[in-house]
Regions:
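N-terminal intrinsically disordered/low-complexity leader segments
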Residues: 1-11
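Generic hydrophobic, amphipathic alpha-helix propensity
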Residues: 9-20, 37, 62-66, 70
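Helix-turn-helix
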Residues: 15, 23, 30-57, 61
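Hydrophobic alpha-helical connector segments
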Residues: 61, 75-103, 154-160
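N-terminal hydrophobic signal/anchor transmembrane helix of membrane proteins
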Residues: 70, 85-104, 190-207
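Amphipathic alpha-helical segments used for helix-helix packing
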Residues: 99-121, 175-180
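C-terminal peripheral helix-coil segments that are non-catalytic and often amphipathic
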Residues: 135, 139, 143, 147, ...
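Membrane-interface starts of transmembrane alpha-helices
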Residues: 145, 149-153, 157
Length: 207
């Protein structure tokens, strides 16, 4: 009975997060309300509060889910390849990042506010999954960059994870930002999540 109840709760939380993610594709964080999310789901606004106390907690749950998916993707790289060249590894990691647009967007745009307005236990769960990301990323480096020392792997991690926060804004500048850059004749180019990830990894891998 308890298992069935947990499965029901998890399913409903997933539906709420799915609705939030759908809205986030076309609306900004501050424009999305619990009411908007309820319209996209089968739940009333009061019902949503049975699963999340704040809008920020929904976004934190969504971000946690995104990191879990990324962890699975990196584990897939480790499990399905015996060997990879540095370039091959850069390409595989770039592919995994390309699929995590929502992860990059939340991290770049709204992470601080989301963390501040979520319950401690949910924040701890997010940090636990994030820690797994760091560990599995290091495991990936250790397997495929065999001649790389532990300290060098740490340097790569400390370069790449902060870099991730800048990927989304460069890949998806707003119309207002583009207009302002054009006004001051600041050059800019169309780049993808894949391109930015791949080129940076090549750089820190020494290619």
């Amino acid at each position: 009975m308890a298992v069935e109840l947990k499965e029901t709760i998890d399913k409903r939380r997933e539906e709420i997060m799915d609705a939030c993610e759908k809205l986030y594709e076309t609306k900004g964080f501050h424009s999305i309300t619990i009411k908007d999310i309820s319209v996209e789901t089968s739940f009333s606004r009061p019902s949503i509060y049975n699963y999340f106390q704040t809008k920020e907690e929904i976004f934190l749950g969504l971000l946690t889910r995104e990191y879990r998916k990324w962890n699975i993707a990196i584990a897939g790289i480790i499990g399905s390849n015996k060997k990879l060249s540095k370039d091959g590894l850069a390409k595989e990691l770039a592919k995994s990042m390309q699929e995590r647009k929502t992860l990059l967007k939340i991290s770049a745009m709204n992470l601080y506010e989301i963390e501040e307005n979520s319950r401690d236990e949910l924040l701890v769960e997010y940090k636990r999954v994030f820690k797994e990301s760091v560990e599995i990323f290091d495991e990936c480096l250790k397997k495929f960059l065999e001649d790389t020392s532990k300290s060098r792997r740490q340097q790569i991690r400390y370069a790449f994870f902060p870099y991730m926060y800048g990927i989304y804004p460069y890949s998806y500048p707003t119309e207002k930002q583009i207009s302002a850059m054009d006004e001051v004749k600041l050059s800019h180019m169309d780049v993808t999540i894949y391109d930015l990830t791949y080129q940076f990894l090549k750089l820190i891998f020494g290619l």
